[in-house]
Regions:
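General structural feature for long, well-ordered alpha-helical segments within catalytic domains
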Residues: 15, 19, 31-34, 38, ...
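Charged (often Lys/Glu-rich) extended helix/loop segments that serve as interaction or gating elements
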Residues: 260-431
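Active-site loop/helix belt of alpha/beta enzymes
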Residues: 134, 144-285, 374
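A charged N-terminal "starter" segment
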Residues: 1-135, 174, 178, 212, ...
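General beta-strand structural signal in soluble alpha/beta enzymes
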Residues: 56, 77-80, 100, 118-121, ...
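Conserved, mostly hydrophobic/aromatic
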Residues: 35, 59, 81, 113, ...
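Flexible loop/turn segments at secondary-structure boundaries
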Residues: 62-65, 86, 147-148, 188-192, ...
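Active-site-proximal loop/turn and secondary-structure-junction residues that shape catalytic pockets
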Residues: 58-62, 83-84, 104-106, 121-125, ...
């Protein structure tokens, strides 16, 4: 079952209202049909590339059920920690469908027996040799020279400059490695398709140099991620077809004349793939009137960190109430006493306690970035399945689980004390 692409995805509520009203809040809800539709669009856009492979960054949405869906849609798992690698294996990915690309890895992470390993720094080579035999194929991450299309590339920490990468490749060849892959990760939310054309140009030029100068076989060229999605109603997603066409033009101009026309082009998109497929459902717990009207909700910054950390905008709507007239500007806050509102200010229909709000486009780097500030347990996650039913795919964390690793573990079985000091269980019954 598939769903048509939403032209205004941040306004879409994919699950029926009655199902959402029955859920305990706060919770995340993901749309299976949207996940599959986006994966299919990506495959279609790059169908011109023989052997095209899309790699999903596990850190964007590390839920085994979602990972299984993406695996069924042909995605590979892109992992940056040993924990992500272990989760990918447990989610059914074969070792050949897992790419391990740690940055500043620990010795234990370098020892992970990944069949597809990417080095971010040439200096890692000696450390890698101490931990494990060199594989027959290694990936190298390029940090391209700043281009007018991605002028902030100078500040990115990902990868090696061309000279360092070529030196590392030559050293690999001397050590018996005959096959290398190339990848890049700008991670800047580049909306202009020309930025990806410029990135492809840098990757393909480097690939041709590896092939011509060192006789190395180039096994792939991965463009990484960074393709943005629309969060405001006035925006539209980056045009994946325009991005693909620009990359294809550079491929035809550089790779085919170099005899590299069979090298697969790859992507590592996270937000573009899953952001629209997730919402955070929350309930209004209180309303404050004043110079600034406030809505308190049961979700907190511990459930969704991105707006406070990065200043990202996420559309908010009221479940079952799309009135335009009589809207008020509310600051949407939580129960953790910090000066800034965690979810921003929004024009919303007048709300009362008990109203349900939907925070949109949180299917990437939403739940995965949750933390326990304020001793807030992680909320539950649900999947709206293609057959129209809801399934719990992660239960809410229990409060006692927050303390499970402490040396002195609090006793949550003890009766709570009343303000008078009398144990709750010993209070006389009324009447």
């Amino acid at each position: 079952m598939s769903a048509p692409e939403r032209r205004d995805p941040q306004d879409a509520v994919f699950a029926p209202e009655e199902l959402l009203r029955a859920l305990p809040t706060p919770c995340y809800v993901y749309d299976e049909a949207q996940l599959r539709t986006r994966a299919a669009r990506l495959r279609s856009a790059f169908s011109w590339s023989a052997g095209f492979r899309a790699w999903f960054p596990v850190r964007a949405l590390p839920n085994p059920t979602v990972l299984r869906i993406l695996r069924e849609e042909g995605q590979g798992a892109l992992c940056v920690t040993a924990g992500e690698y272990r989760l990918a294996l447990a989610s059914g990915f074969s070792p050949g469908s897992i790419r391990f690309a740690p940055e500043f890895p620990t010795d234990a992470e370098l020892a992970v027996p990944a069949a597809d390993l990417v080095l971010d720094d040439g200096g890692l080579l000696l450390r890698l040799e101490r931990e494990r035999p060199l594989p027959a194929r290694l990936g190298l991450r390029l940090r391209p020279e700043p281009d007018r299309s991605f002028h902030k590339a100078e500040a990115t920490r990902f990868g090696m400059r061309t000279g360092e990468l070529l030196d590392t490749a030559q050293e690999l060849r001397l050590k018996g490695v005959r096959e290398v892959g190339l990848s890049a990760m700008l991670g800047l939310g580049l909306r202009d398709p020309e930025a990806f054309s410029a990135l492809a140009r840098a990757l393909f030029t480097c690939a041709a140099a590896l092939h011509d100068s060192f006789g190395l076989q180039v096994s792939y060229c991965c463009l990484g991620g960074g393709l943005p999605v629309a969060h405001r109603r006035t925006e539209r997603d980056a045009d994946i077809m325009a991005v693909s066409h620009g990359v294809q033009a550079e491929f035809s101009r550089i790779m085919e004349p170099a005899g590299l026309g069979g090298v697969p082009v790859e992507t590592g998109l996270g937000r573009w793939l899953t952001a629209h497929a997730g919402i955070l459902l929350t309930t209004v717990t209180g309303v404050k009137r004043g110079a600034q009207d406030w809505l308190g909700v049961d979700a907190s910054r511990a459930d969704l960190l991105r707006p406070e950390l990065y200043g990202t905008y996420h559309h908010i709507s009221v479940l079952g109430d799309d009135r335009v007239e009589g809207r008020r500007r509310y600051a949407v806050g939580d129960r953790i006493p910090e000066p800034r509102e965690p979810f921003g200010q929004r024009l919303l229909p007048e709300c009362r306690r008990g109203a349900r709000l939907i925070i949109h486009d949180v299917g990437a780097y939403g739940a995965s970035m949750g933390y326990s500030y304020g001793l807030t347990p992680h909320c539950a996650e649900y999947l709206y399945q293609a057959d129209g039913t809801l399934r719990c795919i992660r239960r809410a964390q229990r409060e006692d689980e927050l303390f499970s690793t402490l040396d002195e573990n609090p006793d949550f079985t003890a009766p709570a004390e009343t303000p008078s000091g009398q144990a709750e269980s010993q209070r006389p019954s009324e009447g």
